[in-house]
């Protein structure tokens, strides 16, 4: 029998994940009947809509004129909302939408709770570390509001499962942070006729928009026909994020979702917009009018080229479409391991070398290796014609020079520039950066 290719194996894994999810759903359906009897006994309805508990629970929002009284609460209860991502955006949005009385929620996220998530992902607790985020979120929601049904999908959204999942829900909340996933969510939602509430956040800023509103509003591809270059995309782990800033975006996503579900927006009154939030120096929210649906859009335009078949058949590789960052910019001989560097600096040759740390100043101030020099990749290395002013006055470009960053990515680019632009002759990148140093050499160096 021929060996399966990596792509074939991944395809089989994705199909097995989907089959497993369907089996869980069927098993859940069996237990749901008895659960429903127990629920009905505990919360008997006092009319065709709600129990006494629900009237008390939601009363404070039903009396708000803009909300829309009883009929809007009924619309919330009948709605099914899918959250793609249970992280910094998804957690606050889940918290407020489940509390508001959405009837059924789906959560898809293949990630596990990590302690580094807890400062901003407010549904997860210290006890949740190590379990799937969607399961952690479900536990919290079940305690918060027993009237909400929660479905979990502890795997990654893909071409193979996206249609089966998204078509079950009325509204999609895109709480992800990668362009490839955003394009997949957009394309499948447009084809399925679903409105998307989309948010993003990084550092102290964030933005929010409503996409494909009732099929008449612009979609993500209308705004961004081409993805950003891979090198320009910064993740939370690289760029950092202040919890309340991204939390505010998640909360506003929940409010916009309520407005969509309760028909506050209509086909006549909805205008495409982009809300942009800045947390520093002075908090502000600016709202920009966006262009309408584009006739030449690849998925929602007059002659679409992105179709259900092209997605389901994996004719579109979203990671390839958005570009892949090459993890190995340098030739192998220009890189060394942390152990090799450790051995070198503890040898007789180590005294005649220099270590350049290219992390941002804020990261360098958290922790650093002794005798290193901080010259940040961005903005210093990127913009500089030379770095002579940062180096000792007697520095010789034949000196053995080592370059370190946080994970071993920026340091490769800096090493390349030192050789090609600055004329350094003996330069090596330290693979894995200071994070790897902490794991393998010195655990007293904190991982952050």
Swiss-Prot record:
Cofactor note: Binds 1 zinc ion per subunit.
Enzyme class of the recorded protein, top EC level: transferase
Sequence ranges assigned to domain Rhodanese in this UniProt record: 349-446
Catalytic residue list: 236, 405
InterPro entries (UniProt xref): MOCS3/Uba4, Rhodanese-like_dom, Rhodanese-like_dom_sf, ThiF/MoeB/HesA, ThiF_NAD_FAD-bd, Ubiquitin-activating_enz
Keywords, alphabetical: ATP-binding, Cytoplasm, Metal-binding, Multifunctional enzyme, Nucleotide-binding, Nucleotidyltransferase, Transferase, tRNA processing, Ubl conjugation pathway, Zinc
Entry binding sites for Zn(2+): 219, 222, 297, 300
Main location group: cytoplasm
UniProt: ATP binding residues: 88, 109, 116-120, 133, 177-178
Named cofactor requirement(s): Zn(2+)
GO cellular component terms attached to this protein's record: cytosol
Purpose of the protein: Plays a central role in 2-thiolation of mcm(5)S(2)U at tRNA wobble positions of cytosolic tRNA(Lys), tRNA(Glu) and tRNA(Gln). Acts by mediating the C-terminal thiocarboxylation of sulfur carrier URM1. Its N-terminus first activates URM1 as acyl-adenylate (-COAMP), then the persulfide sulfur on the catalytic cysteine is transferred to URM1 to form thiocarboxylation (-COSH) of its C-terminus. The reaction probably involves hydrogen sulfide that is generated from the persulfide intermediate and that acts as a nucleophile towards URM1. Subsequently, a transient disulfide bond is formed.
Protein name, UniProt field: Adenylyltransferase and sulfurtransferase UBA4
Organism: Debaryomyces hansenii (strain ATCC 36239 / CBS 767 / BCRC 21394 / JCM 1990 / NBRC 0083 / IGC 2968)
Organism taxonomic ancestry: Eukaryota, Fungi, Dikarya, Ascomycota, Saccharomycotina
């Amino acid at each position: 029998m021929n060996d399966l290719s990596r792509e074939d194996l991944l395809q089989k894994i994705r199909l097995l994940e989907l089959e497993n999810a369907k089996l869980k759903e069927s098993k859940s359906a069996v237990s749901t009947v008895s659960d429903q009897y127990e629920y009905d006994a505990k919360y008997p309805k006092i009319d065709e809509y709600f129990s006494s508990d629900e009237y008390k629970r939601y009363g404070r929002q039903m009396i708000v004129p803009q909300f829309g009284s009883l009929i809007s609460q009924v619309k919330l209860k009948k709605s099914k909302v899918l959250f793609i991502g249970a992280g910094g955006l998804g957690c606050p949005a889940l918290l407020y939408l489940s509390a508001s009385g959405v009837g059924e929620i789906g959560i898809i996220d293949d990630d596990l709770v990590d302690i580094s998530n807890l400062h901003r992902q407010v549904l997860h607790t210290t006890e949740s570390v190590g379990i799937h985020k969607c399961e952690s979120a479900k536990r919290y929601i079940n305690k918060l509001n027993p009237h909400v049904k929660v479905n979990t999908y502890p795997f990654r959204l893909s071409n193979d499962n996206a249609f089966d999942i998204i078509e079950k829900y009325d509204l999609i909340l895109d709480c992800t942070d990668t362009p490839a996933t955003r394009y997949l969510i957009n394309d499948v939602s447009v084809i399925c006729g679903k409105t998307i509430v989309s948010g993003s956040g990084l550092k102290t800023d964030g933005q929010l928009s409503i996409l494909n509103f009732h099929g008449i509003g612009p979609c993500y591809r209308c705004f961004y026909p081409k993805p950003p270059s891979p090198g320009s995309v910064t993740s939370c782990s690289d760029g950092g994020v202040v919890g309340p800033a991204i939390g505010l975006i998640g909360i506003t996503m929940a409010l916009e979702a309520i407005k969509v579900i309760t028909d506050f927006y209509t086909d006549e009154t909805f205008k495409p917009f982009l809300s942009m939030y800045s947390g520093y120096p002075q908090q502000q929210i600016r709202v920009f009018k966006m262009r309408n649906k584009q006739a030449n859009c690849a998925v929602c335009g007059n002659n679409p080229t992105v179709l259900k078949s092209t997605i389901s058949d994996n004719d579109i590789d979203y990671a390839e479409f958005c570009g892949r960052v090459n993890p190995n910019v340098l030739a192998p001989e220009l890189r060394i391991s942390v152990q090799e560097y450790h051995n070198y600096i503890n040898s007789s040759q180590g005294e005649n070398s220099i270590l350049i740390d290219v992390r941002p100043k804020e990261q360098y101030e958290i922790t650093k290796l002794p005798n290193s020099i901080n010259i940040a990749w961005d903005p210093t290395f990127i913009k500089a014609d030379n770095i002579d002013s940062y180096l000792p006055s007697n520095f010789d470009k034949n000196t053995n020079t080592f370059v370190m960053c946080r994970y071993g990515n920026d340091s490769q680019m800096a090493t390349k520039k030192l050789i090609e632009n600055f004329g350094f002759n003996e330069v090596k990148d330290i693979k894995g950066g200071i994070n790897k140093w902490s794991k393998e050499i010195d655990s007293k160096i904190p991982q952050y």
